[in-house]
UniProtKB/Swiss-Prot annotation:
It is found in: Cytoplasm. Signal peptide: none annotated. InterPro entries: Ribosomal_eL22, Ribosomal_eL22_sf. One of its GO terms (molecular function) is structural constituent of ribosome. GO terms for biological process: cytoplasmic translation. Component of the large ribosomal subunit (LSU). Mature yeast ribosomes consist of a small (40S) and a large (60S) subunit. The 40S small subunit contains 1 molecule of ribosomal RNA (18S rRNA) and 33 different proteins (encoded by 57 genes). The large 60S subunit contains 3 rRNA molecules (25S, 5.8S and 5S rRNA) and 46 different proteins (encoded by 81 genes). PANTHER family: 60S RIBOSOMAL PROTEIN L22, LARGE RIBOSOMAL SUBUNIT PROTEIN EL22A-RELATED. Gene3D superfamilies: 3.30.1360.210. Component of the ribosome, a large ribonucleoprotein complex responsible for the synthesis of proteins in the cell. The small ribosomal subunit (SSU) binds messenger RNAs (mRNAs) and translates the encoded message by selecting cognate aminoacyl-transfer RNA (tRNA) molecules. The large subunit (LSU) contains the ribosomal catalytic site termed the peptidyl transferase center (PTC), which catalyzes the formation of peptide bonds, thereby polymerizing the amino acids delivered by tRNAs into a polypeptide chain. It comes from Saccharomyces cerevisiae (strain ATCC 204508 / S288c) (Baker's yeast). This is Large ribosomal subunit protein eL22B. It comes from the Eukaryota. Belongs to the eukaryotic ribosomal protein eL22 family. Pfam families: Ribosomal_L22e.
Amino acid sequence: MAPNTSRKQKVIKTLTVDVSSPTENGVFDPASYSKYLIDHIKVDGAVGNLGNAIEVTEDGSIVTVVSSAKFSGKYLKYLTKKYLKKNQLRDWIRFVSIRQNQYKLVFYQVTPEDADEEEDDE
């Protein structure tokens, strides 16, 4: 009996990152972020080898990554954290998953109780 040689179709995966919250405050540049992703995404073990496999687009406050190659949300989170650390924003902004393949950059919540405790210590 002949082996099954049918190939699986390439699945196109779309990941979206909503960067509206930090962009409105003027601390985040979506164009710079999308350029960073283009420059640092690895395809087949090589940086800058996007070709037709991965497309990064920026539309206002939404950055979209469309991939027909292997690309995970964890890798996008890793690259985003590296970008935030490089631009010294990691202490104020975090990368949060909203739904499957949809992410958002939000500010850390500072509770008023923490601020009161700091004032009491002094």
